[in-house]
Amino acid sequence: MKTTISVIKADVGSVAGHAVAHEALKKKCDEILAEARDTGILEDYYITNCGDDIDLIMTHRNGEENEEVHQTAWNAFREATEVARGLKLYGAGQDLLSDTFSGNIKGMGPGCAEMEFKERPSDPVIIFCCDKTEPGAFNLPLFRMFADPFNTAGLVIDPTLHNGYEFEVFDVVEHKKVTMACPDEMYDLLALLGSISRYVIKKIHRRDDGEIAASVSTERLNLMAGKYIGKDDPVAIVRAQSGFPAAGEVVEPFAFPHLVGGWMRGSHNGPLMPVAQRDATPVRFDGPPRVIGLGFQIADCKLVGPIDMFDDPSFDRSRQLASEIAEYMRRHGPFEPHRLPSDEMEYTSLPGVLEKLGDRFEDMD
């Protein structure tokens, strides 16, 4: 019997702006998920938050895109929204784009990453949760995990990794997808993945047998809503060890705080800072963007753990570097490259400014 992991997240309210989800919201989610576990919909669950996003980590036997599981997550977020409204929290229910559930949570606002697999004798899984950034934030670290031998030594020396992986890439603008193999199509793959606001990794499979290796939430809130709602704040599930990169190879890419889109009002580039869960409270200019990593063992569809993967002094220098990069980027104020390019400002005030100035623009000599 196969095990399914579903990680579904949403921002349904925060204390003092966009800093952190209130504990009362997580408690309400816990009540809903506990009932689902007791009735057999879920086998196990763990609730955490990265900044103002609540992340529901659930295991079950129902496969991906299961209506009952998605309904459970939706109910949890709806109930938490009511609590948020009672506390007058900021952005109560902001990620929920509909009032009624329609059978699948996709397209309704919350982000969702899922994978189904037959458990190995030992099955380590790492769940990554971000705040103040977009799904493309995972492009670079996932590429390094599964295609860069300078990061993942196993690609060179481990026979079970040596034949590489297949990357399923979504074009979130045109709503198309393509699957590309590494190392054969590495350069073509990088040509896409470098455009992190448009091309995003959805899933990664092992080439030898098609076994699932990683899954990412790819929902783009603003594209769904047609206006600025908030940043997408993606989540990812990554399997480790025994045919996949070692746990240390999985977290290693985050030692480099690469630049991602998001931060203040979802309109600025900044470094992705790897932090312990307790430090996932983005405050400076609503950031800089954060990522947490929780490591579990999957045992008969139960979650063993977690271990806080970035609660490690060896990442202290990465955090220091991220702070230095944040300081440098902030000094640019409203100028690029700190502010996103104009084609990424569609849901801000920029279109209105251009419309207001339309009659004042003249042809140049």
From Swiss-Prot:
One Pfam family, short name: FBPase_3
E.C. code: 3.1.3.11, 4.1.2.13
Any GO MF annotation of the entry: fructose 1,6-bisphosphate 1-phosphatase activity
UniProt-annotated binding residues for dihydroxyacetone phosphate: H18, K132, R265, D286
Amino acids binding Mg(2+) 2: D52, D53, D131, D233
Domain comment in the entry: Consists of a single catalytic domain, but remodels its active-site architecture via a large structural change to exhibit dual activities.
Protein name: Fructose-1,6-bisphosphate aldolase/phosphatase
Source species taxonomy: Archaea, Methanobacteriati, Methanobacteriota, Methanomada group, Methanobacteria
